[in-house]
């Protein structure tokens, strides 16, 4: 692209009308499916008309086939929506979900959109949920694990290829015993569920996110708990080389010693031959030299120079840095860390706004590494962060799918909110694949943070004679009107 400007490579950025997409076409499959769905449970209907609609727009913009859209919408309505709990009755969640801790507003679901590394790939959509059940928020279930375990069990029965033995084994090793007061004092959500809904697949891939809330366990994860869990899950002779490489870097490398282990892991719910588990860390250093050192494990893991160049371009764009800014210097941040200036209600160990995870399996000599950037700590607005990434994608030949993502987020919140607030965009994640940066967006429905706006969209205004009167934002058709 040479010296082309962002407007030249991405001209659609100048047109909100174009970027908003065609609401009717975005929701056509959603409305057709909705005609035949039950409406007797108000809680499930609420989640369907809000988050189900978001999912429909995502799939339309990601070019999923209509058959796949119908299949996944039915899965969403009958498997996911019933496990999202009661509909909100105020802007304060009755139970604060651990989805996107420190960033989320308590909504029990979040989304991700993965672009891939070239123009021939389709976006890949995932959901991350905390299952809500009858015991959630009670003293009978302080870790909120019963609803999640029930859901995982049902997914194992319902979805071909889902296997749970590794998840159960890892969970047993990191589950706190709750036998001492310090552990009970921090007890909270312990299981999240990831659901990958690929465009071309006939199935759904499942991941179990496991969180220990025991302060005594976290320092022992790398040294004793994860090694025992690996041998239990993969077999007594399973190679620990990948885990040992991570531990060596964290404990002995000068750059690794900036890292702090988080009490979190995640397990692919599939056969042991391909199921990986994740080790999450956060850092106190935000210089690009440090980020690059972690992504290569201090040179232990070879990566293409072009990958590192692309990562630097993205990091500098997100931070608004001059290209000549020294890679060894830490950029200053004047951004308030709370989304929209409000605290989420959950403590967040990720003070710097940067986390990494290492994907490990005994058969791989190196872990797969992903960098996650908390947008609320590094950019002024959601749109500023989104533009930094989508303009990079456009220059790389992925302008259509970059625009598709803009269509999704602009269908979820007004453009003015994207320009002036933070809260929809949670993270951007970056990994190396085939000599390029593989980018994933993590974003949030903001059901509680935008409670008033959501209610207004669900219930159009009445005129002085009691007739429905749609707001200007909802002209053509209410975005939630499905029945």
From Swiss-Prot:
The keyword Transferase applies. This is Prenyltransferase vrtC. GO terms for molecular function: prenyltransferase activity. Viridicatumtoxin and its derivative, viridicatumtoxin B, exhibit anti-methicillin-resistant Staphylococcus aureus (anti-MRSA) activity. Moreover, viridicatumtoxin and a C2 acetyl analog, spirohexaline, have been demonstrated to inhibit bacterial undecaprenyl diphosphate synthase, a potential new target for antibiotic development. It is an enzyme of class 2 (transferase). Belongs to the tryptophan dimethylallyltransferase family. Keywords: Transferase. Prenyltransferase; part of the gene cluster that mediates the biosynthesis of viridicatumtoxin, a tetracycline-like fungal meroterpenoid with a unique, fused spirobicyclic ring system. The first step of the pathway is the production of the malonamoyl-CoA starter unit for the polyketide synthase vrtA. The aldolase vrtJ may be involved in the synthesis of the malonamate substrate for malonamoyl-CoA synthetase vrtB. The polyketide synthase vrtA then may utilize the malonamoyl-CoA starter unit, followed by sequential condensation of eight malonyl-CoA units to form the polyketide backbone. Its EC number is 2.5.1.-. Pathway: Secondary metabolite biosynthesis; terpenoid biosynthesis. Transmembrane segments: none annotated. InterPro entries: Aro_prenylTrfase_DMATS (IPR017795). GO terms for biological process: alkaloid metabolic process; terpenoid biosynthetic process; viridicatumtoxin biosynthetic process.
């Amino acid at each position: 692209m040479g010296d082309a400007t962002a407007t030249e490579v991405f001209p659609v950025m100048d047109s909100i009308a174009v970027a908003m997409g065609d609401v009717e076409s975005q929701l056509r499959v959603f409305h057709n499916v909705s005609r035949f769905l039950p409406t007797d449970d108000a809680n499930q209907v609420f989640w369907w008309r809000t988050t189900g609609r978001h999912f429909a727009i995502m799939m339309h913009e990601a070019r999923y086939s209509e058959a796949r859209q119908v299949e996944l919408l039915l899965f969403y309505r009958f498997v996911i929506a019933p496990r999202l709990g009661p509909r909100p009755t105020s802007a304060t969640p009755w139970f604060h979900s651990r989805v996107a801790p420190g960033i989320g507003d308590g909504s029990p679901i979040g989304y991700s959109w993965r672009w891939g590394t070239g123009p021939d790939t389709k976006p890949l959509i995932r959901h991350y949920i905390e299952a809500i059940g009858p015991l959630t928020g009670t003293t009978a279930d302080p870790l909120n694990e019963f609803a999640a375990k029930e859901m995982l069990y049902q997914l194992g029965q319902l979805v071909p290829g889902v296997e749970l033995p590794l998840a159960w084994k890892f969970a047993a090793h990191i589950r706190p015993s709750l036998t001492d007061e310090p552990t009970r004092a921090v007890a909270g959500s312990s299981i999240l569920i990831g659901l990958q809904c690929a465009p071309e697949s006939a199935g759904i891939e499942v991941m179990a996110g496991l969180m220990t809330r025991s302060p005594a366990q976290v320092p022992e994860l790398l040294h004793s708990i994860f090694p025992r869990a690996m041998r239990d899950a993969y077999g007594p002779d399973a190679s620990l080389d990948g885990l040992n490489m991570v531990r060596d870097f964290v404990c002995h490398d000068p750059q690794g010693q900036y890292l702090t282990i988080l009490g979190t892991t995640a397990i692919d719910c599939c056969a042991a031959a391909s199921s990986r588990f994740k080790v999450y860390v956060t850092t106190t250093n935000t210089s690009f030299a440090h980020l690059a050192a972690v992504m290569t494990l201090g040179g232990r893991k070879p990566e293409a120079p072009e990958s590192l160049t692309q990562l630097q371009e993205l990091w500098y764009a997100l931070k608004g840095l001059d290209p000549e800014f020294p890679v060894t210097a830490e950029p200053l941040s004047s951004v308030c860390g709370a989304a929209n200036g409000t605290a989420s209600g959950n403590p967040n160990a990720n003070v710097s706004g940067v986390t990494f995870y290492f994907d490990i399996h005994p058969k791989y000599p190196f872990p797969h590494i992903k960098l996650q950037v908390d947008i609320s700590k590094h950019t002024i607005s959601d749109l500023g962060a989104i533009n930094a990434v989508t303009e990079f994608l456009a220059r790389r030949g992925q302008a259509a799918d970059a625009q598709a993502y803009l269509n999704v987020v602009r269908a979820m919140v007004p453009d003015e909110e994207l320009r002036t607030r933070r809260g929809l965009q949670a993270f951007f994640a970056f990994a190396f694949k085939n000599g390029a940066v593989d980018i994933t967006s993590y974003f949030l429905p903001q059901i509680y943070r935008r409670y008033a706006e959501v209610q207004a969209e669900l219930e159009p205004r009445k005129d002085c004679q009691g007739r429905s009167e749609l707001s200007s934002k909802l002209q053509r058709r209410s975005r939630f009107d499905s029945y």
